[in-house]
Amino acid sequence: MKPLKFSWYFLPVLILAGESVFILPYVLSRIFRPTVLQVFQINNVELGLCFSTYGMVAILSYVFGGPISDRYSPRKLMSLALILTSFGGLVYAQFPGFYGLKILYGYWGFTTVFLFWSPMIKAARFWGKTSTQVKAFGFLEGGRGLVGALIGTIGVLVFAYFLNVSDSKFPNLEQSRNAFKYVVLLSSVIVAFVGFLVWKFMKVDQEIEKSVVLEKISLNKIKEVVFLPSVWLLMVIVMCAYVGYKVTDVFSLYALDVMQYNQVDSAEFATFLLYLRPLIAISIASFASRWENTLMLVIGFAVSFLGALLFSFGIITYSKTLLFLSSIFILAIGVYSLRALYFSIMEKGEIPLPLTGTAVGIISLIGYAPDIFIGPLMGYFLDKYNGIIGHQYVFALLSVFSLVGFFAAIKYHAIYCNEASHSLFESHE
């Protein structure tokens, strides 16, 4: 096989695609959650049910999309996913009713997962063979965070410009919809354009591409992955880490409900937090040669647990801005470091590169199950218990998952930290 060589723009385009595909279903609602609730005339539970619909479709997509990604080129699957996802933005901009919104989220569950998720992880592992896995996933996660933050900043500026009201804390429905519509349409154009960039610029040598694409997926190959202990531990690790990432969706709402920010200020605050994601992930990548990534994963869960506890105690109130900011920073370090690490440990777990898509699909079946239940559960707490009480329940829930993830990460570290990694490109016939 030829030596691995990638164009300098391979990783930047992969990073750009990796976040752009989730702008419409996730990033906008994370930054503009209070606005999304208003313009679609829904509550937190109903928004959570939309995410559940996404999650249920995504679960099936993980299972069947994983093997598909081992059969076809990541470039082709990812570019198609981005184009199809952008079409959903045209529907989103029409502000469909609750049931229409659920159908749309189900559609996005297919386009962003079946066609995109496993191919993206496989492409990152592929690129990481020329460097290290921690650097590959650290740069991917950090870059994705930077892309999300920049697009979020643009979105907030567009929203504030078109809102055009003197008191932006209480815009009426028509004003909010008019401003948010421009944000959605701009986002849709960006997603479609990135799809073109992926198709055009993520090409690799055909001989190299064939080395990581299987001619057919057999049941024996799937069984080979299913019976790896690392796959089962990664299911738990990813699930617990992902709950933390989902909880970041309520940061802007916490700023509005508890810290008494207005709509624009809460969106600006949520966007500011997005800039912590690349800072933390890239810092993790820079420590890759000094620390075991499995050990860093253990520390990440410990920090996430500490941050969640601070919020669950109910001591972070309107008058304690410094405590609010420092606690957010602690929690962000834990959550975002975990995002940069959990797929980087696949190589230590002896998961072969040609079967990455299948492995990611199986891991994600449980790992991303919070897409189904965590949204409605958070929505229930936030709607039933007004103000800080509802948020306390949400963060208490996160502390439990962080603790479970902590022990799963310790187990993974104990099993694999001293074992020599197998070659990613070894033959599996």
PLM segments and residue spans:
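Flexible cytoplasmic inter-helical loops of multi-pass small-molecule transporters
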Residues: 199-220, 419-427
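Glycine-rich segments within core transmembrane alpha-helices of 12-TM secondary carriers
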Residues: 135-164, 364-375
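C-terminal membrane-cytosol helix-exit motif in multi-pass small-molecule transporters
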Residues: 155-164, 186-209, 408-412
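Helix-to-loop junctions at the C-terminal end of transmembrane segments
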Residues: 61-73, 280-293, 382-383
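Cytoplasmic membrane-interface "Motif A"-like loop-to-helix N-cap segments
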Residues: 71-82, 289-303
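Extracytoplasmic gate region of multi-pass secondary transporters
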Residues: 29-33, 148, 152, 229-274, ...
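A late C-terminal transmembrane helix in Major Facilitator Superfamily
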Residues: 350-386
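C-terminal transmembrane helical hairpin of 12-TM major facilitator-type secondary transporters
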Residues: 294-345
